[in-house]
Swiss-Prot record:
Pfam families: FtsL. The gene is ftsL. HAMAP family: FtsL (MF_00910). PANTHER family: CELL DIVISION PROTEIN FTSL (PTHR37479:SF1). Its main location: membrane. This is Cell division protein FtsL. Keywords: Cell cycle, Cell division, Cell inner membrane, Cell membrane, Membrane, Transmembrane, Transmembrane helix. The chain crosses the membrane at residues 4-21. GO terms for cellular component: cell division site; plasma membrane. It is found in: Cell inner membrane. The keyword Coiled coil does not apply. It is a single-pass type II membrane protein. Essential cell division protein. May link together the upstream cell division proteins, which are predominantly cytoplasmic, with the downstream cell division proteins, which are predominantly periplasmic.
Length: 109
């Protein structure tokens, strides 16, 4: 065999190994893609389930039931309501200086 034939054989073998390597990488990336898509689908299902649970837990009837049973709260009645009346000078507005870190920095006036 001539040197040219040996050189070409080495080039062909290198190309064949390169094709095998790229095919293997493509398969691994495709497997990762399928796993990511499966995880995305599972997360979407979990999110929908959590939204349903949130809506069920935030219903007014459930909140009232928990307030009366767990916290021993009772509905407001006029007989138990106490009204406070203030004398005309009892409520007085007082200016309190703000610390420098809480002072407004030029918003709307």
């Amino acid at each position: 065999m001539s040197r040219l034939n040996i050189f070409l054989l080495i080039i062909v073998m290198g190309c064949a190994l390169s094709v095998v390597n790229s095919t293997n990488q493509q398969r691994q990336i495709f497997i990762q893609l399928q796993r990511a898509q499966s995880q995305e689908h599972q997360l979407q299902q979990d999110y929908a389930q959590l939204q349903y649970q949130q809506s069920a837990l935030s219903k007014t009837s459930r909140i009232e039931q928990l307030a009366t049973s767990s916290l021993k709260m009772q509905p407001i009645t006029t007989g138990r309501t106490q009204y406070l009346t203030l004398s005309p000078g009892a409520a007085k507005a007082v200016d309190v200086p703000l610390p420098a870190s809480a002072a407004p920095t030029g918003g709307a006036r």
